[in-house]
C-alpha cells in the first residue's frame, strides 16, 4: 500500500490550485495517502519576454517536470492538458484527467463586451497564434500585442491601458476566482474554437508505475478522457507547435457519439480551414487523424 505521493507541478498560483484539485480527488478515494506537492520552476516560467513559438513552445512548461518524473524525483505530475504536446516521452503516459471545465475563451475588457464592438485598430493582448487567427478573421483591423505572464500580470497591463482588451481562458479565471461578469465576456465556440485540451487538468505518470496507474484509474473522469482522444490525435498527427494555429473541440451528442470541430491555419494566420466530424466514441481517435490528413491536403 502506498503511503505517500510526490506530486510535481509548476509553481504558479493556478498550477498549485489545479494540483490541489487533483489531491482532493485522490483524498476522496485514498484518505490515508499523504500527498506532497513538489513545486518545479520550468523554462517557460523563467523566459517571459519572448513568444512561446520563438523559444520552444508549450513543452517548456513541462520539460523540467517530466524530467523529474523520469528521474523518479516525483511520482506523478499535474499539468494543464493544453500545455502538453501531441508527443510526450515514450516512458510517460497521461493516466488521468479531471472533469473538463468550460473550455471557452474570455474577452476581458473594461469598456466593450465583444471583439466585434472594440474600436477601430484597438489593441488586444494575447500570445496564442490560435487566438490571433480567430481575431484576424473576426476583425482584421485589430492589433495584437504579444502578452505572456500570469493572469494577474496580464490583467494589470489591461488596467494600466497598455492594451484595450486581453483574451484568457474561462477555466483559468474561474479556478483563480477572478471571473468578473462585468469585465469578462465569454466567446462562443462558433467564433473562437478552444485550444486542444483547454479546461482539462491532466495527470502524467511513468508507464511502468502500476501503483500510480491504479490510483489514476480511480480518479480519471472517463467521459472527459474519451473526448480528448480525437483532439489529441489531431494534434499528434499534425505534430503542431506554438507557431501553428490549431484548434479542436469534442463534445457529446449522446452516450455513444461525439461531434468534433477542427481548425487549422497557416503560419501567418491568413488562411483558416474548418472541419466538423461526427463519430462513435470507439472510432474517435481515428477520426482525429483522418481530419488532420484531410485538412493538410487542403492547405
Curated annotation (Swiss-Prot):
CDD domains documented for this protein: PBP2_PBGD_2
Highest taxon listed in the record's lineage: Bacteria
Record's keyword annotation contains Transferase: yes
Keyword check for Chloroplast: no
Any single GO BP term: protoporphyrinogen IX biosynthetic process
SUPFAM superfamilies: Periplasmic binding protein-like II, Porphobilinogen deaminase (hydroxymethylbilane synthase), C-terminal domain
Cofactor(s) needed by this chain: dipyrromethane
Enzyme class: transferase
GO cellular component term, pick one: cytoplasm
Catalytic reaction(s) noted: 4 porphobilinogen + H2O = hydroxymethylbilane + 4 NH4(+)
Pathway(s) it belongs to: Porphyrin-containing compound metabolism; protoporphyrin-IX biosynthesis; coproporphyrinogen-III from 5-aminolevulinate: step 2/4
EC annotation from Swiss-Prot or TrEMBL: 2.5.1.61
Positions carrying S-(dipyrrolylmethanemethyl)cysteine: 242
Cofactor note: Binds 1 dipyrromethane group covalently.
Subunit structure: Monomer.
Miscellaneous comment as given in the Swiss-Prot or TrEMBL entry: The porphobilinogen subunits are added to the dipyrromethane group.
Protein name (record): Porphobilinogen deaminase
Organism: Rickettsia prowazekii (strain Madrid E)
Amino acid at each position: 500500500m502506498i503511503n505517500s505521493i510526490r506530486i510535481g507541478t509548476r509553481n504558479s498560483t493556478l498550477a498549485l490550485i489545479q494540483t490541489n484539485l487533483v489531491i482532493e480527488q485522490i483524498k476522496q478515494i485514498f484518505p490515508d495517502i499523504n500527498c506532497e506537492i513538489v513545486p518545479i520552476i520550468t523554462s517557460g516560467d523563467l523566459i517571459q519576454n519572448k513568444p512561446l513559438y520563438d523559444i520552444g513552445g508549450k513543452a517548456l512548461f513541462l520539460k523540467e517536470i517530466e524530467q523529474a518524473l523520469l528521474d523518479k524525483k516525483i511520482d506523478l505530475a499535474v499539468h494543464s492538458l493544453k500545455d502538453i504536446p501531441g508527443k510526450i516521452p515514450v516512458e510517460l503516459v497521461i493516466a488521468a484527467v479531471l472533469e473538463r471545465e468550460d473550455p471557452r475563451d474570455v474577452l476581458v475588457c473594461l469598456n466593450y463586451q465583444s471583439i466585434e464592438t472594440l474600436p477601430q485598430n484597438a489593441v488586444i493582448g494575447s500570445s496564442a497564434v490560435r487566438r490571433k487567427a480567430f481575431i484576424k478573421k473576426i476583425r482584421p483591423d485589430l492589433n495584437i500585442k504579444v502578452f505572456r505572464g500570469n493572469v494577474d500580470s496580464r490583467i494589470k497591463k489591461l488596467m494600466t491601458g497598455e492594451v484595450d482588451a486581453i483574451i484568457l481562458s474561462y477555466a483559468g479565471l474561474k479556478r483563480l476566482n477572478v471571473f468578473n461578469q462585468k469585465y469578462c465576456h465569454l466567446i462562443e465556440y462558433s467564433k473562437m474554437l478552444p485550444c486542444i485540451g483547454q479546461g482539462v487538468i491532466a495527470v502524467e505518470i511513468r508507464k511502468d508505475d502500476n501503483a500510480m496507474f491504479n490510483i489514476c484509474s480511480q480518479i480519471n473522469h472517463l467521459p472527459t478522457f474519451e473526448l480528448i482522444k480525437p483532439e489529441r490525435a489531431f494534434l499528434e498527427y499534425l505534430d503542431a507547435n506554438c507557431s501553428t494555429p490549431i484548434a479542436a473541440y469534442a463534445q457529446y451528442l449522446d452516450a455513444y457519439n461525439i461531434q468534433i470541430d477542427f481548425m487549422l491555419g497557416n503560419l501567418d494566420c491568413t488562411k483558416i480551414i474548418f472541419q466538423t466530424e461526427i463519430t462513435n466514441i470507439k472510432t474517435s481517435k481515428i477520426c482525429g487523424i483522418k481530419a488532420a490528413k484531410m485538412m493538410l491536403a487542403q492547405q
